[in-house]
Each structure stands twice: as structure tokens, then as C-alpha cells.
Amino acid sequence: MHIFDYSFLDEGLLPAEIVNLTATITAFNAISDTRKESNKSIYTELEKIARVQSVKGSNAIEGIVTTDARIKQIVDGDSAPLNHDEREIAGYRDALDEIHSKHDQMSFSENMILHIHETMTNLAGYELSGKYKTEDNLIMEIDERGRRRVRFTPVSAADTGEAMQQLVLAYMDARDNPKINKLLLIPCVILDFLCIHPFSDGNGRVSRLLSLFLLYKSGYDVGKYVSFEEQINDSKDFYYEALQESSIGWHTNENSYFEYMKNFLSMLYKCYKELDKRFSTVNGKKLKKTERVEQTVLNSVLPVSKAEICDILPDVSPSTVEAVSYTHLRAHETLANL
């Protein structure tokens, strides 16, 4: 069985790119904490947008989709889910809301992980909701010719309970080591969780919820204001490449966590960049309203819709947003579904 050991994070032999990304993210986080105290209304608006984008993005990665209008209605509680996909979406909403609102009261444990899975899958009627898999599973991919191949063989169902116990204990041991940067520990734990693949379904979505939770516990709350899940969805090919690279040799303890760590930190860095740009745009009171609309779109890392612009800039009317030259904005290929 794989040995869960994060002591390499204490050895000071990390790639320069990882060290630099960590330092930059830490600096961004400090700036955000300072801004948040004196700009609560702005952060409240950003939180509303991120909540919808997180539910949409995390489910879209798994092919669980509906219209943008329906997602917003479900996330805002304005409509009950109408089909299986919408029940999956509503379940993710419930689990996400619990992490956002109750992370201070929760601890990383097997019971917590099982509870998050149960909350996420309960509405969709999963037979094994909140329970580990009872049969072995495989991670497969389909090539352009429709042929399947095994991408990774997770831990067997028989060994899943022990593996999850060892994962949690290894996390606790590393978390309590003052020489280990907690931010670097998170992607290592998430990679191991995905290699165990403890559930019959929902592992990817649970991994993203756990990422947000562990970020909260380590003092990083950017995922509340910019969707971490949507960043992954926007670059999912690179995400899966990093995941595969870091899982090679996992069962024999010969894998390297570095590629997945770099990908995780890069996504987090993009979240902070997006937060910084959105804050600067919303806070740019000296700009004309049309200029603020343009800056919102052009500074956005991800495509942004008209409705989202109106949410980001609540003092700008929808008619003003529509009056902006979309021809100019489309040239930058960042405006989505106006």
C-alpha cells in the first residue's frame, strides 16, 4: 500500500517555481485580508458571483450541466431541481454552502469527508451516499477513436478504509509540523485522495470541496470570492495532465507531487489575480462607468457575461453595460454569452 508521508515538504528541496508561487499567493492573501475589512460590500457582491460560478464550474468538469439561468435559480434557492443533473447541482450547492459557513466548526476527518459526500449526493439518490465504495473502480479515458484505456487504478475497495485513515493521520501529522507550509500540504493531500478514489462516484467534486475547506483552514479564503472550481474547469486539460503526471508510481511510493502542486498553486494564483483585478475595477470610482465595464471584461481571466458584469458593478445599469462597444471587447475574446 502507498505510504502517506509528507515529510518531504520539510526538507527544503522544493522547485523554485513552487516557492515563488507560494510567496506571491501569500502576499496576495495579505492584501485581500486588508481590503476586505474596509470594503465589505464589494466582497459581498463578489461572493454572490463566485458561489454560482463554483457550483457551475465544478459540476461542468464532470459533465453535469444545465442552463446558466437554471443554475442561478437553483443556487439562489429560487427553484427546486427538475431532473437528475439539477439534483446533483443542488447537492453541490448544499455542500459548498456548508463549507463556506461552517468550516470553522469542522475538522478534517473521515467522518467529515463522508458527511460532505452525503450532503453532495443525497438529493440525487445515490445508493452509497456518504459511504465508501464497495467495488473496485478504475479511472478511464476515451481517445478520439472512442477506445477506452485505464488511466489509473485506484486503491481497492477492500483497502479504502485503511487508506483514508492513513491519509487523515498523515495530514494531521504534517499540519502540526511548524516547518511545513500548510499551503503546500493541501495539493499533496488532494492528490492522494484522488488516487484512493474512495467513492463510487463524486470523487472529483468532493476533492474540490475539500480543497476549499483545507484552504479555509490554512487561512486562504479566496475561493469564497472567486471560483476556484471555475479556474480548474477553464484549464481542465492542464489539470488532468498534472494529475496524471503526479500519480505515476503512486502505488509504489515513487511518484512526485510537484506537477500537481504547481498546477494547484497556479490555479490559486489566478484566483487572486482575478480578485485583485475585479476589486480594482469595482473600486475605480474615478473611471467613467463605460470604462469600468470595459476594464471588468478586459481584466477578467475568465469569460464574463453581461449579468455577471451587472453583479460586479451594481451601480452601473444594464443599459450602460449594453451600450459598451462589444465589437471592441470581442476582439479580446473574453466576453461570454451576452
Predicted regions and their residues:
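N-terminal low-complexity segments that are often proline-rich with Ser/Thr-Pro
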Residues: 335-337
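FIC/Doc superfamily catalytic core
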Residues: 1-333
